Amino acid sequence: MEKQEQLYEGKAKRIYRTSLPDQYWVEYKDDATAFNGEKRAQITGKGELNNRITAIFFTMLKERGIDNHFVRLLSATEQVVRKVEIIPLEVVVRNIAAGSLAKRLGMEEGTVLPQPVVEFYYKDDALGDPLVNASHIKVLGIASESDQATLERMGLAVNEVLVPYLRERNITLVDFKLEFGKTADGEILLADEISPDTCRFWDSVTNEKLDKDRFRRDLGNVEEAYKEMLTRLGGDVHV
């Protein structure tokens, strides 16, 4: 397999075509962004940490029956994924009130929700990735009702696997963002990444934040928190 032209560059990754028609080459960057790109910085080693953390999560989820686009690691910062067309919806699953949910509904951060809350956000940087409901999704033609139901079901299935998996490692899964894509034959796969960039991870004992909130809120020690996550997931830290 050969790396070919760059297809896309986002806030955290570059995507390249490969010599195989059904696979892409993904390169993770050290760029850190928050607030829809308004806050930016470089965090040495972040690309490698997120690449390896994502590989661990996706491999584990595939073993537990949740199919995804991950194929294999290529290098410290690169991986091969199956080619999918990304559905322009971010699926957010929340177990504990934090971030925008706490602010929007006037809830105290850290409040345990009686059941997981699933939210959909329209992937559009120009609009600020707005929160949308089923009617919005239908009117905008973003996804069919059937696909929307599949995304919600898969999001909750991921949650059911991740919560106990992380609890065993003394990590509380507060909330997380998922993206999904369709293969050429219409199969919906979990895609993008699962990392401290896309999840809120708290230490189960101290509630110390082990995720991008350390960057968002200027808490410091961002790289150290990401390293701690990789270590607890059983990965070796080389950064």
UniProtKB/Swiss-Prot annotation:
It catalyses: 5-amino-1-(5-phospho-D-ribosyl)imidazole-4-carboxylate + L-aspartate + ATP = (2S)-2-[5-amino-1-(5-phospho-beta-D-ribosyl)imidazole-4-carboxamido]succinate + ADP + phosphate + 2 H(+). Pathway: Purine metabolism; IMP biosynthesis via de novo pathway; 5-amino-1-(5-phospho-D-ribosyl)imidazole-4-carboxamide from 5-amino-1-(5-phospho-D-ribosyl)imidazole-4-carboxylate: step 1/2. Belongs to the SAICAR synthetase family. This is Phosphoribosylaminoimidazole-succinocarboxamide synthase. One of its GO terms (biological process) is 'de novo' IMP biosynthetic process. It is an enzyme of class 6 (ligase). Signal peptide: none annotated. PROSITE patterns: SAICAR_SYNTHETASE_1, SAICAR_SYNTHETASE_2. Its EC number is 6.3.2.6. Keywords: ATP-binding, Ligase, Nucleotide-binding, Purine biosynthesis. It comes from Brevibacillus brevis (strain 47 / JCM 6285 / NBRC 100599). One of its GO terms (molecular function) is ATP binding. InterPro entries: SAICAR_synt/ADE2_N, SAICAR_synt_PurC, SAICAR_synth, SAICAR_synthetase, SAICAR_synthetase_CS. It comes from the Bacteria. The keyword ATP-binding applies. The keyword Ligase applies. HAMAP family: SAICAR_synth (MF_00137).
